[in-house]
A protein has these predicted regions:
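Short arginine-rich
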Residues: 146-152
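A short beta-sheet element
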Residues: 39-101, 109-121, 194, 212-213
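N-terminal basic, Ser/Thr-rich segments that initiate or prime the first beta/alpha elements at protein or domain
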Residues: 205
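Sequence-specific dsDNA recognition surfaces
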Residues: 11-54, 71-72, 76-79, 186-200, ...
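Non-catalytic DNA-recognition/assembly elements of restriction-modification systems
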Residues: 1-24, 28-39, 123-138, 146, ...
Length: 225
C-alpha cells in the first residue's frame, strides 16, 4: 500500500546521511586500479583503494556542483567531489533522485568557481517517507524515465529518417535530366557579396534585415536571431 501519510517531518541531512570528503588521489592512483576515481564531473582515473561504498551519490564540491552522479560500485572521490552516503532511513536511489531535484546552486556563495561547503549541505532539509514508499517512488521515477528515454530514441530515429528522406527528395528532383541545360550561376542571376552591418541601419526606427550564415538552415531562413 502506498504511504498515505503526507505529514512526514523535514529532516536535516546531518541526521540521516554521511558526507565523505574527497582526498587527493596521488598515492592510490594506478592504471589498472580496481576502483574508479571520481571528480565532480565523472571518472578521471583508477585507484587501488576506495573511500565510498556502492550506492553513494557524488555531489561536486567545486566546479560542477549541480550534476549529481549515482555510483553503483566502490570508488575514490577526489577533493573536488563529496560522497553523499545514505543512512538506514534512506534508499540510495531515493537520495540520488532528491539530489537530482535539488538546486545546489542556491548554496553557492563563491564569487568565481562554483563551490559548496560541507556545513551547508548538512543543513539541507528533505522529507523522508517510509522505506516502502521510497521504493515505490523510485520505481515510478525510473519507469517514467525509461518511457522518456524510449520517446527520445524514437524521436532521434524519426529525425534521421526525415533527413535521409529530405536528401532523397533533393537528389531526385535536382539531379540533372537529359533535357536540362547546365550553365553558370552568373548566366541566370547575380551573386552579391555581403557587407558588415552599418550602425546607421541598425539604429534607425525600422532596421534593415541582416542575414548571416547562421540564419540559413536546411529548413529555410531562421530570422529568430
Amino acid at each position: 500500500m502506498p504511504d498515505t501519510n503526507f505529514t512526514h517531518p523535514m529532516r536535516k541531512w546531518e541526521d540521516i546521511l554521511t558526507i565523505v570528503s574527497g582526498k587527493n588521489q596521488k598515492n592510490v592512483e594506478t592504471d589498472n586500479g580496481q576502483y574508479p576515481i571520481y571528480g565532480s564531473g565523472g571518472i578521471i582515473g583508477r585507484a587501488n583503494a576506495f573511500l565510498c561504498e556502492a550506492g553513494t551519490t557524488i555531489v561536486g564540491r567545486k566546479g560542477t556542483i549541480n550534476s549529481p552522479i549515482y555510483v553503483n560500485e566502490r570508488f575514490w572521490n577526489v577533493d573536488t567531489a563529496f560522497g553523499i552516503v545514505p543512512g538506514p532511513e534512506l534508499l540510495p536511489k531515493f537520495l540520488y533522485y532528491f539530489c537530482r531535484h535539488f538546486n545546489f546552486k542556491d548554496l553557492d556563495k563563491s564569487t568565481t568557481i562554483p563551490s559548496l561547503a560541507k556545513r551547508d549541505l548538512l543543513a539541507i532539509k528533505m522529507v523522508v517517507p517510509s522505506l516502502p514508499e521510497q521504493e515505490r517512488i523510485v520505481a515510478r521515477i525510473e519507469e517514467l524515465f525509461s518511457e522518456l528515454d524510449k520517446a527520445v530514441e524514437t524521436l532521434n530515429t524519426t529525425k534521421q529518417q526525415l533527413a535521409v528522406y529530405r536528401q532523397a527528395v533533393l537528389t531526385f528532383h535536382l539531379t540533372p535530366k537529359d533535357n536540362w541545360r547546365i550553365c553558370k550561376a552568373s548566366e541566370i542571376g547575380e551573386v552579391c557579396l555581403g557587407r558588415q552591418r552599418s550602425p546607421q541601419n541598425v539604429a534607425k526606427d525600422y532596421p534593415t534585415k541582416y542575414i548571416r550564415a547562421a540564419n540559413i538552415t536546411e529548413d529555410g531562413l531562421d530570422l529568430s536571431d
